[in-house]
Curated annotation (Swiss-Prot):
<dbReference type="GO" id="GO:0019843">
    <property type="term" value="F:rRNA binding"/>
</dbReference>
<keyword id="KW-0699">rRNA-binding</keyword>
<keyword id="KW-0694">RNA-binding</keyword>
<dbReference type="InterPro" id="IPR014722">
    <property type="entry name" value="Rib_uL2_dom2"/>
</dbReference>
<dbReference type="Pfam" id="PF00181">
    <property type="entry name" value="Ribosomal_L2"/>
</dbReference>
<comment type="function">
    <text>One of the primary rRNA binding proteins. Required for association of the 30S and 50S subunits to form the 70S ribosome, for tRNA binding and peptide bond formation. It has been suggested to have peptidyltransferase activity; this is somewhat controversial. Makes several contacts with the 16S rRNA in the 70S ribosome.</text>
</comment>
<dbReference type="GO" id="GO:0002181">
    <property type="term" value="P:cytoplasmic translation"/>
</dbReference>
<dbReference type="Pfam" id="PF03947">
    <property type="entry name" value="Ribosomal_L2_C"/>
</dbReference>
<feature type="region of interest" description="Disordered">
    <location>
        <begin position="1"/>
        <end position="20"/>
    </location>
</feature>
<comment type="subunit">
    <text>Part of the 50S ribosomal subunit. Forms a bridge to the 30S subunit in the 70S ribosome.</text>
</comment>
<dbReference type="InterPro" id="IPR022666">
    <property type="entry name" value="Ribosomal_uL2_RNA-bd_dom"/>
</dbReference>
<dbReference type="InterPro" id="IPR002171">
    <property type="entry name" value="Ribosomal_uL2"/>
</dbReference>
<dbReference type="GO" id="GO:0003735">
    <property type="term" value="F:structural constituent of ribosome"/>
</dbReference>
<dbReference type="GO" id="GO:0016740">
    <property type="term" value="F:transferase activity"/>
</dbReference>
<feature type="compositionally biased region" description="Polar residues">
    <location>
        <begin position="7"/>
        <end position="20"/>
    </location>
</feature>
<feature type="region of interest" description="Disordered">
    <location>
        <begin position="219"/>
        <end position="276"/>
    </location>
</feature>
<dbReference type="InterPro" id="IPR012340">
    <property type="entry name" value="NA-bd_OB-fold"/>
</dbReference>
Length: 276
C-alpha cells in the first residue's frame, strides 16, 4: 500500500499522512463474521484502570479472524481484501469450496482470486498454512502458534515476518521480528509469507484529534503531576525528579529496568535474546 499526503490547508493537515487503501476491494464486511465489541476504556471487571491512555474512539465491530487455519485439505479462494479497524494488518475473506467463509490475516502480495490451502500437504506459497515441520528452512512465515491447535499468537502485526532457521528434533528454530531466536514445537502451524500493509508504520497521525478517533487518550508526564499522583511529581516549578533513576507511576524503576521474571518457564525455548 502507498502513503497519501495532504496539502497543508490547516496545521492538522500539514504533516498528516494516511493509507491510500489501494489494496482494499470492499468496504462491506461479511455480516456472518462480525461480533459486537463494547468499549472497555482500559478498565477491568472491577472498573479499575489496568491500561492507561485508553478510552473513546469510533464505534467498531469485531471481525472474527481464523488464527487456527484448520480447514485442512479444503481449497479456498480469496474473495476480498478488507480493512480491519481492530488491527494494523488488513484481512482477507476466504470462500472455501465446502461453503465455509473465514477471515484470515492478509499476507503481502495476496490478491483476490488466489487459491489458498491449509494442512500438512499444502504447497509452500503465499497464504497457505501448514505445520512448521513441513516448512523448508529459510521460508518467511507469520501467524505462528505457540501450542498446537491454539491458533497463531506470534507475528500478526502489519509488515512483520519471521524466518524458519532450522529443525532440532521436535522443535523448529524461528527468528522473530525482534531478532529473538526461539524454539517452537514442530507441530505448531504458521502461515507462509509476510503480513501485508507494511507501510502502516510510516503513517503520521498529524493531530491530537485523530488519536482520539483511535481510542487513545493523552499521556501526561509524571513531572507535571502532584506527588500523590506520581513519584516524579511536586516541587517548585520545573524540578528534577529527585530520584536516582526514573520511576513508573507505581514507584518501580523504569527506562531500561528489566521487568521479565528470572527463571521464567519459557526461558528454555529462547536460544538468543532479542536485539536491544
Amino acid at each position: 500500500m502507498g502513503i497519501k499526503k495532504y496539502n497543508p490547508t490547516t496545521n492538522g493537515r500539514r504533516n498528516m499522512t494516511t493509507n491510500d487503501f489501494a489494496e482494499i476491494t470492499t468496504d462491506r464486511p461479511e455480516k456472518s463474521l462480525l461480533a459486537p465489541l463494547s468499549k472497555k476504556a482500559g478498565r477491568n471487571n472491577q472498573g479499575k484502570i489496568t491500561v492507561r491512555h485508553q478510552g473513546g474512539g469510533h464505534k467498531r465491530q469485531y471481525r472474527i479472524i481464523d488464527f487456527k487455519r484448520n480447514e485442512d485439505g479444503i481449497p479456498g479462494r480469496v474473495a476480498t481484501i478488507e480493512y480491519d479497524p481492530n488491527r494494523s494488518a488488513n484481512i482477507a475473506l476466504i470462500n472455501y469450496v465446502d461453503g465455509e467463509k473465514r477471515y484470515i490475516l492478509a499476507p503481502k502480495n495476496l490478491e483476490v482470486g488466489m487459491e489458498i490451502m491449509s494442512g500438512a500437504e499444502a504447497d509452500i506459497k503465499i497464504g497457505n498454512a501448514l505445520p512448521l515441520i513441513n516448512i523448508p528452512v529459510g521460508t518467511v512465515v507469520h501467524n505462528i502458534e505457540l501450542k498446537p491447535g491454539r491458533g497463531g499468537q506470534l507475528v500478526r502485526s502489519a509488515g512483520t515476518s519471521a524466518q524458519v532457521l532450522g529443525k532440532e528434533g521436535k522443535y523448529v528454530l524461528v527468528r522473530l521480528t525482534s531478532g529473538e531466536v526461539r524454539l517452537v514445537l514442530s507441530a505448531c502451524r504458521a502461515a507462509v509469507g509476510q503480513v501485508g500493509n507494511e507501510s502502516h508504520e510510516l503513517i503520521k497521525i498529524g493531530k491530537a484529534g485523530r488519536s482520539r478517533w483511535l481510542g487513545k487518550r493523552p499521556t501526561v508526564r509524571g513531572s507535571v503531576m502532584n506527588p500523590v499522583d506520581h513519584p516524579h511529581g511536586g516541587g517548585e516549578g520545573r524540578s528534577p525528579i529527585g530520584r536516582k533513576s526514573p520511576m513508573s507511576p507505581w514507584g518501580k524503576p523504569t527506562l531500561g529496568f528489566k521487568t521479565r521474571k528470572k527463571n521464567k518457564a519459557s526461558d528454555k525455548f529462547i536460544v538468543r535474546r532479542r536485539k536491544k
